[in-house]
UniProtKB/Swiss-Prot annotation:
Coiled coil: none
InterPro entries linked: C365.16-ike (IPR038781)
Keyword check for Translocase: no
Name of the molecule in the record: Uncharacterized membrane protein C365.16
Subcellular location: Mitochondrion membrane
GO cellular component assignments: mitochondrial membrane; mitochondrion
TM spans (from-to): 22-42, 73-93
Domain of life: Eukaryota
Organism of provenance: Schizosaccharomyces pombe (strain 972 / ATCC 24843)
Length: 277
């Protein structure tokens, strides 16, 4: 072997750009959440006020719209808006960051790749349930009947089950059924969160009824009758609410994330090719 011979240069690994990718995840999550939060807050308030008997759905929605138009600053800087915004930005960010960190750990060259499985489901469910229960506990006290009081543990359990179902049908089920639907993943993302409302809305109404009327003296049959009284219109309202939350909001979050991560990946590859030239 000649004295001046050197081993061939191996290609440099693609830079991970960890913080840039996390920044894109955060931007996509907060932008999607900011877009849908006003609508979500309006529907959530109307359901709580309607169930407690303080207002009808339409009257509550009308009052909220007038408030947004007349006092936008007070609306967007209010505690209820902050709770809704934190809930959805936190949920989207958890899903985004798990995908990104998993791709970095496995050195996946495709920046926008998404993961699935129990770890992501449990993590996103924990984030969503924790923030959602916090939001709903405040909303129930803000707009429920009587003076504010602690939320019973049974209400927390019902809210947690409701949120686990919502996450499963928003993040895990769509990729499974997408090949079976015209329009693929986007169609699945829009349909499945709405479909699960037939199961989750009764849980939501039962929790509100337990808080509003309380007491172990109320029979199960009476609870069921009260839930059935509000079920149809509340299910429709929650479908209308969930469509932007995990349908439109989910599509927007994914679109922003994939677009900017694709751009970052292309710039990174060009820099690497230039460095090797």
């Amino acid at each position: 072997m000649a004295l001046n011979s050197q081993p061939p240069l191996s290609p440099k690994p693609v830079p991970s750009n960890t913080w840039k990718r996390i920044g894109i995840d955060a931007f996509a999550a907060t932008a999607a959440s900011a877009m849908i939060s006003p609508f979500i807050l309006t529907i959530d308030r109307s359901i709580v006020e309607n169930t407690s008997g303080r207002s009808t759905l339409l009257r509550s929605v009308s009052r909220s719209i007038k408030y947004v138009l007349s006092k936008p600053g007070a609306f967007f800087f209010s505690a209820p808006f902050a709770l809704v915004f934190t809930l959805y930005s936190g949920t989207y960010m958890t899903a985004n960051s798990i995908d990104t960190l998993d791709n970095i750990r496995h050195k996946n060259p495709v920046f926008k790749a998404e993961t699935s499985g129990w770890f992501k489901f449990c993590s996103v469910t924990a984030a969503n349930s924790g923030l959602s229960i916090l939001k709903d506990s405040f909303f129930t006290k803000f707009w429920g009947t009587g003076s504010p009081r602690p939320l019973p543990w049974s209400c927390y359990g019902l809210y947690g089950l409701r949120d686990a179902l919502t996450i499963a049908f928003s993040f895990n089920i769509p990729p499974m059924i997408a090949p079976l639907l015209p329009g693929g993943l986007i169609t699945a993302q829009l349909l499945t969160p709405c479909a699960v409302q037939f199961i989750s809305t009764p849980l939501h109404l039962l929790s509100l009824d337990i808080y509003n009327r309380g007491g172990p003296n109320i029979s199960a049959a009476n609870r069921v009758m009260q839930v059935r009284k509000h079920l149809l219109k509340s299910t429709f309202a929650r479908m209308v609410r969930i469509l932007p939350a995990f349908g439109i909001g989910g599509v927007t979050n994914r679109k922003l994330r994939t677009t900017y991560l694709d751009s970052l990946q292309q710039r990174t590859m060009k820099k690497q090719q230039f460095a090797l030239a």
